[in-house]
Amino acid sequence: MVDLRVQIGRLMLENPIMPGSGTFGEQLTSVLDVNLLGALVTKTITADIREGNPPPRIAEFKDSVLWSIGIPSKGPVHYVDTLVPFYRQFKPPLVASISADTVEQFGELAARISVPGVNAIEANISCPNLKKDGNAFAMDPEATEQVIRAMKSATPLPVWAKLTPNVGDITVLARAAEAGGADALVVANAMLAMAIDIHTRRPRLGRVMGGLTGPATKPVILRMVYQCAHAVQVPIIGCGGVSSAGDAIEYMLAGASAVQVGTASFLSANTMLKVIDGLRDYCETHQVARIRDLTKAMVGPHEVRLEDALTV
């Protein structure tokens, strides 16, 4: 019998597969046995009610999807009063994703949603820091550390920092999040991108730029997971372009302890369950007794320096 359990800080998950924030909603529970997942991750919650970005919000390509949703949110009251009671009926640990405009607001929101039934908080720090220069918190090491530290002071729950790939050296941000007290890192959010309709000459998205997700992003995010795994001691959750067990295994070999599935679930609601079954089959075929033994188990050169890699 293969042991699929993985440890993410203080949380023990029955398996390493969970949804990416924003890709999982209550409607999926009617078509998917969510009790088979390792964890549940909510859509991102903000301190205020938000409608989201103007349309068009989505542009699809054969190997990726470009999004500009804008984090629509019904606010913390709706989350605490409605969503948490709903998710309590399921077995997997519940991870609440939050986003805020200031360091202080991150701490305040973390405290507000730290209610029974919530097992961890994921900090979406790819939003702009309105009190500083308007750049994303996750692009600034100092701001990243401040946000995580504020959240750790405000809640007894584990805090996961979701990093952005839109930086030069992601290990700098990974170390900053770890210094702030992050219990785990989610690597990574969507990649900033854009597209233009050549017939209308207009941008494909209402806000011009958006976040690129899907298989096309996996090699880039995989590299970032590998780098972060050699830069920090906290667990890493890989996120980007996972649609098969093979993708998840690659992330684990690169250094991830768990994996989030996002875009692929829109194409097939059962993707996460297929990935879990595939992980079990792989372990049985390759005589891997514990799936956690795959983490950071890539064979070959380790700790490749960025400057050496750039000479290809």
Question: For each of these PLM feature ranges, what is it?
Answer:
Residues 34, 39, 101-237, 243-256, ...:
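Alpha/beta enzyme core
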Residues 22-23, 240-242:
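Active-site metal-binding loops of divalent metal-dependent hydrolases
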Residues 1-94, 100, 275:
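N-terminal capping/small domains of soluble enzymes
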Residues 37, 52-62, 196-210, 252, ...:
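C-terminal helical cap(s) of enzyme catalytic domains, especially alpha/beta-barrels
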Residues 218, 277-312:
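Extended, intrinsically disordered, low-complexity segments
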Residues 22, 45, 126, 190, ...:
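Flexible loop residues that form catalytic
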